[in-house]
């Protein structure tokens, strides 16, 4: 049993459900390529929409998977059309009711929610960057609490007073985020690089969890990622399409998270279930070579 998954399901957050749904999406997507059943692409569309309703970042999988259906070698045009059609039907019947509900209630097209602008503002904030430079755990905790309760609360009140609808508020947040970038371009560049690196950090944040827990987490993450990528590399020649698909899948979520706040618990649902599979392959090949 993977300790990280066991820990996550004891916490009330979206990641465990999101992990299940994106993993199910990949399963049904890949099964759809191998079978003639229309159920698999349909269920892939349903799963990716449910994942998007859990965490909107999964919306990027909809065009990605549709394109992958189109460029998969060896699929005839008729089957490709059927796969894409069933996939998009699954997306539509799952996502449309919520979007329609939002339009009826707010008079605006809101696919999932209006948090994009707010999250972009957080990911461009000078104060958020300064938090990442604090080394002491107690000082980090105090500064984080002050940011959430004082600075953010003040700006939230200003945004709510200046806009009267969900998407209008999101646009105000986005505009403030762009102003952050304009006012501090070098800082934003450094922060973006830091977020890009931290996304792949193989230990918990010592600022938040302390050095001991960070070290213990590294003893779990490092072997998984080393063995997982070794197992994945084994597919580079035996199944190059799967190899490229998984690599692009990982990179897609990586790039999508960089403009926003980055913590490794956002990476885990995307990468770790897949790498566990490839870790199993790497271990199996290792023991076969010992015989």
Task: Locate predicted features.
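Transmembrane helix irregularities
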Residues: 1, 12-14, 20, 33, ...
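Hydrophobic alpha-helical membrane-interfacial segments at the cytosolic entry of transmembrane helices
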Residues: 42-48, 62-65, 77-103, 278
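Membrane-interface anchor segments at the N-terminal boundary of transmembrane helices
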Residues: 162, 172-173, 179-246, 256
């Amino acid at each position: 049993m993977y300790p990280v998954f066991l820990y996550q399901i004891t916490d009330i957050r979206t990641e465990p459900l999101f992990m299940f749904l994106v993993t199910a999406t990949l399963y049904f997507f890949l099964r759809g390529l191998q079978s003639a059943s229309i159920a698999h692409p349909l269920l892939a569309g349903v799963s990716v929409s449910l994942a998007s309703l859990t965490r909107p970042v999964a919306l990027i999988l909809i065009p990605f998977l549709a394109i992958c259906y189109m460029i998969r070698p060896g699929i005839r045009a008729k089957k490709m059309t059927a796969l894409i059609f069933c996939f998009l039907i699954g997306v539509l019947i799952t996502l449309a009711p919520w979007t329609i509900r939002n339009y009826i209630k707010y008079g605006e097209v809101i696919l999932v929610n209006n948090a994009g602008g707010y999250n972009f503002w957080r990911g461009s904030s000078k104060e958020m960057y300064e938090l990442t430079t604090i080394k002491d755990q107690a000082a980090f905790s105090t500064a984080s609490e002050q940011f959430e309760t004082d600075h953010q609360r003040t700006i939230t009140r200003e945004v709510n007073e200046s806009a009267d609808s969900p998407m209008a508020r999101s646009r105000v947040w986005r505009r403030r985020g762009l102003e952050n970038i304009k006012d501090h371009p070098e800082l934003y560049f450094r922060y973006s690089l830091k977020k890009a690196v931290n996304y792949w950090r193989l230990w918990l944040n010592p600022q938040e969890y302390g050095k001991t827990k960070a070290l213990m987490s590294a003893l779990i993450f490092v072997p998984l990622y080393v063995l997982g990528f070794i197992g994945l590399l084994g597919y580079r020649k035996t199944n190059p399409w799967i190899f490229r698909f998984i690599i692009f899948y990982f990179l897609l979520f990586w790039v999508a998270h960089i403009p926003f706040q980055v913590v490794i618990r956002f990476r885990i649902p995307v990468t770790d279930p897949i790498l566990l599979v490839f870790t199993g392959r790497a271990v199996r090949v290792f023991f076969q070579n010992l015989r």
